[in-house]
Amino acid sequence: MQAETDHFDVVVVGAGPAGLSAALNLVRARRRVLVLDGNRPRHAATLISHGFLTRDGTPPHELRRLAREEYLAYPEAQYQLAQVRQITALAEPRDYPYQTETHTTGATGLFRVEAAGVNGKPDRTVTTQTVLIATGLREELPALPSIRSFYGMGLFSCVACDGYEYSDQPIALIGETSDVAWRALLISQWSDNLTVFTNGVDAVSEGQQALLAERGVAVDARPIADVEGGRDGVTGIRMQDGSTVAVSGGFVRPRWHAQLEFAAGLNLDADGWGLLTVDRDGRSSYAGVYAAGDITSPGPQQLIVAAGSGARVAATINRDLIGIPTARGR
């Protein structure tokens, strides 16, 4: 890890799998990198992660610890617990520095990044040629009294991550969003005993309900009172009419919120869900600003997918920095 400096090639905002994967690849390219970690991981409630090659069954917090350790082993690496408050563009993007018949590098700029220290750490203000936004998303669960207590230990949001453990069991999908029917079709490949609970919200159309019925998926639109269960997990969904539907666990579709107030001055393009719009290489609508992981479309995916996204965008950033000397002056 290098001594503290005030100027970097890349500032990475967020220290999840996307941000740390990108940071690791960038320091290996001898780029001067600062990772700013607000220490609010979306997977904080999840006890075990799945599907990460060589790390299946590893807790997400352990994956983050190992990733930080590997990143900080390089002399160009810096890491700080700090919540980014503002990113300001200080200069117009420089011209595209390199072009061939098959590849054109992106433009980079100059930015000031201001961050407030967390957990007793100091504030930090630095400048950087590029910024990678890998903040992930904030989750808003349906407003049920006990749902947060079971989240990560009986109710999950990632079907690809946790569907296997509920194979052939009676399971629930709680969701109030317009894509809940599509998610139910996906979940139905793990169990033929699935009930979709929309909590009184008209989230499933008649056509979607017919399609779900063909797959043996029930739809219960009654208002929910609460989730029932104990230390071993979820046992049922209690409705406001007093009845309970027995389940062994299941899934919830949160509403996801992109917290990008710190980048408001850059007017970054986003889709209808608030996710950042990027090109296939991770470049945002503002030259020199990139995004990776859950903050980009299609939103939350497996940890290994986010890590791969970070590695891919790191390669883009390094190419776009051609002509800017590395930490070793090359």
Where are the model-predicted features located?
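A conserved FAD-binding loop/helix module that cradles the flavin
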Residues: 23-24, 181-185, 292-330
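A Rossmann-like FAD-binding core segment of flavoenzymes
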Residues: 65-128, 191-277, 319-330
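FAD-site-proximal beta/loop scaffold in flavoenzymes
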Residues: 143, 149-165, 254-300, 312, ...
